[in-house]
């Protein structure tokens, strides 16, 4: 693991954006694994600005998103389909036919099969991850098998509580999702993890310095050959 710690979130997100701009310019047709939630938004904002400044192009990029809520139509403002269009895709030159997000409205078994088939046909060059306060990656909650592929998952209460800030009330937060599995995530050539804030410090510590155990899904990253972690000082505060 290569661990980068920054004084401020602004410095962190500039560094992550520079990392992606360099990587995309070196391989313009790469396949990116993307994440949702509040963590990647500043990265996407920096990448949009870089595109507007003609520093990077996404026209030959293929993307796979980690997950989608079950039961939310694409048109729902909090679906990850809508999120990706609003936060990135609508603002850059990406071909939407080359973007892949699990379906939240198909029968879950069909959605899983459709997404896994597309995923298996590609090699993800860089997989972006955020970190749940309970150590989840994607929507792979504690206890998920390290051998898991794309699957339906029940969201942990802590995840529902964390995500409720995006909804009008906690009762509106979906309780199930389809997520890329941990085995799929680990198949990526490179993994980029972003974690900020003191509320993530315990999960960061366990991810990096704790035992590799399915009770802390992100701990599996210790077994990957090429992981780059971007932390602000608050998220890194428990590291020794």
UniProtKB/Swiss-Prot annotation:
It comes from the Bacteria. Gene3D superfamilies: 3.40.50.1360. Pfam families: Glucosamine_iso. Pathway: Amino-sugar metabolism; N-acetylneuraminate degradation; D-fructose 6-phosphate from N-acetylneuraminate: step 5/5. Keywords: Carbohydrate metabolism, Hydrolase. One of its GO terms (cellular component) is cytoplasm. It is an enzyme of class 3 (hydrolase). GO terms for biological process: carbohydrate metabolic process; glucosamine catabolic process; N-acetylglucosamine catabolic process; N-acetylneuraminate catabolic process. GO terms for molecular function: glucosamine-6-phosphate deaminase activity; identical protein binding. The active site is at residues 67, 134, 136, 141. Its EC number is 3.5.99.6. The keyword Hydrolase applies. It catalyses: alpha-D-glucosamine 6-phosphate + H2O = beta-D-fructose 6-phosphate + NH4(+). The keyword Hydrolase applies. InterPro entries: Glc/Gal-6P_isomerase, Glucosamine6P_isomerase, NagB/RpiA_transferase-like. NCBIfam families: nagB. Belongs to the glucosamine/galactosamine-6-phosphate isomerase family. NagB subfamily. Catalyzes the reversible isomerization-deamination of glucosamine 6-phosphate (GlcN6P) to form fructose 6-phosphate (Fru6P) and ammonium ion. This is Glucosamine-6-phosphate deaminase. The gene is nagB.
